[in-house]
Amino acid sequence: MKKTLILAAALTGLTLSATAQQVKEKLNRAPVAVKTSQGILVSWRSLTTDEKELTFNVYRNGEKVASNISDVTNWLDAEGKPGDTYKVETSKGETSEATAWDNMFTSFDVKRPASIKSGNTTGRYRPDDMCVGDVDGDGNYELILKWLPDNARDSGKEGYSSPVIISAYRMDGTALWQHDINLGLNIRSGNHTTQLVVYDMDGDGKAEILCKTAAGSTDGTGAYVSEAGDATIQATDNTKTYVTSKGRVSGGEEFLTVFNGLTGKAMKTIWYSPGRSGEDFPTSATAANSYFGDSNYNRSERYNAAVAYLDGLDKLPTAIFQRGYYANCIIWAVDWNGSELSTRWLHKGLSGKWLTLDGKGDTLYSESGKSSFGQGVHGISIGDVNTDGYDEICIGSATISHEGKLLCTTGKGHGDAIHLADLCPDRAGLEVMMPHEESPYGYDVHDATTGSIIVSATGSSDNGRGLAADFVPASRGYEFWSSADGIMRSCVDGSTVFEKKPDTNFRIYWTGDPYDQTFDGHYNSSTESAAPCIKNFNTTTQSIYTFQNFSDYGAPMSCNTTKATPCLQADLLGDWREEIIMFQHESDFSSPTCKILIYSTPEPTKYKVPCLMEDHVYRMGIVWQNSSYNQPPHLGYYLPDYLGVDGTTYTTQTVSHAPETAIVPEADEGTETLKTPAADKGVVTGNCYTAGENGELTASESSGYIKVRTNNNDAIVFSVNEGYEIVGFTIEGYSNNTSTTADRSIYMTGVYIDEAETNILDEKVTFPGGTAGQSPVTKTVDGFEAKSKIKLTFDNSNITTKEEDANGKNKQLYARVSFQYKKTASAINQVFTENVAIANDGKVYTLDGKQTTTAAKGRVYIKNGKKFVK
């Protein structure tokens, strides 16, 4: 944004300039009331349509507590408490309400999709990326959640994967659809494959969902998506899979489906373009070849998706789908008018040339020389980069015009991150920062319109991470840093701004300053947990520090393992600061439900900024945030200039106003999975079970299956831990014996509960082995209440004496066991002080108050006034 535009903005009451374009999305005030260390912070949206004279009143439980607020859209109520009802009232009589949270986050439970088998694995589901859209047109956002199984695969890796599942919720967790969308086995699950478009595409005020589908994909009503296609598509064999023995999808029908956001129903399905072998407009199943750069079903399975306004903001938007970026790069622009999906154009970036086709396959434009070939990134960005009133598509090292032409390319190739924003506020248009994966590696900042290089450097290896953010106030414009080194540099001229760098992940507005902070999930691969935090720049001490830790606020978990991104970061509620959505950490993914956590800032601010979702570049960023390696959204204008803030004298906020920590309590019932012991014949103690006490368990694991010895005594015993009842279990497995000459199946013959001698197993279960094969078999047994133990008995007669050793080694299953439990009223976690004179002396007492130093395993004792199990 130029200084002349800033002056014009100042003279017109600080309205946004023409470069900060607006979208036509119905937005209400979306008030939120967050508990802080100082009371309750109430905030609400400022909108670009607000008159300058508009003021706000705030009511608590019907009583007016603040009047005629005009210069901010947040108010701290020192006397507020969780559960209070707040009403925000405008001077025009508009009202909206919110109930105060009991912390700086709220949570809701969602039902986990059932595990799904694929090949020799079974995927258990965890929340992954989220998108947001108003699916019913009421001015409130709904959440669209993509579930990924724990056997999801990178496109570059072999292995079976279970299907992608998609579900929809209101902000309070209410599920919207009759069924989840299930993309089926012919869509491989992973970060590179399924990119969701959630946006109002036909102008009816309600968001649709678009994504790639295939034979076997089903919609939110349970119907096959092929039923919404033409006659040829309707004839698809939805029972057929094209998954190879290595878990790759080698061929088959490829579709694009648009779903009704409110019901999940497939409204229209067409053939996906291009096909996996580069077919421009296929009309039948295709088979892969090396068109996209390799022949192992990897580079053809790299996708991005976005939305762009190619006719200007007063016309309907267009969905953008990209396939391929390491070599041939195809970008497909698709319109939805409420009844039909149609091709606007298809851009093809080939080696030494590019061309653009219309929906009939006729060439609209073409040119030899530089192209978008090999210039893509694990992401995509949208914006009117040259202020001509039309969106351009930034794929990384190249920009595509609204007509599908190549606008520019740097020729610097592929990278893992992209940041499109007003990085250089004194320069016309928008700029791009990106790191580079391919030689000569390094990084660059370039003009998104011309491709001219502003800052660049080369390196000696893959530069896998990079971030651009306005992090240091005194440095005008954005700064950037990357994995190449530890230095923070200016996007404007490349000069060193700071000798250290913060996290290289997401930028965020949280503290109330008109400058960026950083967010990172800090994934720990050894514990499979996260330690999310926000970092800030302290202008007084000239240092980078952690402003806010999240681990003790609901035990949140970030997405995408080492990428450690939020499910979603966006300005969803309250004023202009951004919300963070994550899910609660779990030791496994076996419980029937999981918690979604929504965080909103507890920090007051003196700045009034229109809802970020009204800025076009930012709103488009929320659409594409889920694409590939999730990237943070950026504004299309320079916020300090809009607010008239001088960064050279600015002092950042350094004190968090977060409330006391809060751990979300576990459910009273749930599911827990058998874990692998640290050593052979080891004992594993879970929350509800103890296993391996008779030496059944080995330390060997494969694809989530544990080797469990059925032993020479032909039995396995699981003990029930104090404070729990086990009410059901599921065992999935197969015999470990792989004889090629005989059936070596193992039979489960009985299930016995506690001390009862009655077998509750309804029929013998065969776990196949040898010539019977090694495909997993699943059996669920429930309807009981085990208080002490569960005994499983087996028939190992198919395993001959010659094939077994002294430990019954070959009498073993590859098994996955999950237990359904409920907590009992054992009061183990309740305070118990009746017979204990000194409750907090750190010593161990029996239940009758006698001190002991020889506590026995499995018994209940008292320490520091609380019961525990040894």
Q: What is each of the regions a protein language model found here?
A:
Residues L47-N61:
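Solvent-exposed loop/turn segments flanking beta-strands in beta-repeat/beta-sandwich domains
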Residues E757-T824:
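Terminal, low-complexity interaction segments
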Residues A658-P659, K822-D848:
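Residue-level detector of functionally pivotal "anchor" positions at catalytic/ligand-binding pockets or at interdomain
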Residues S702-E725, Y734, Q774-K779, L813-S818:
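Short beta-strands within extracellular/lumenal beta-sheet-rich domains
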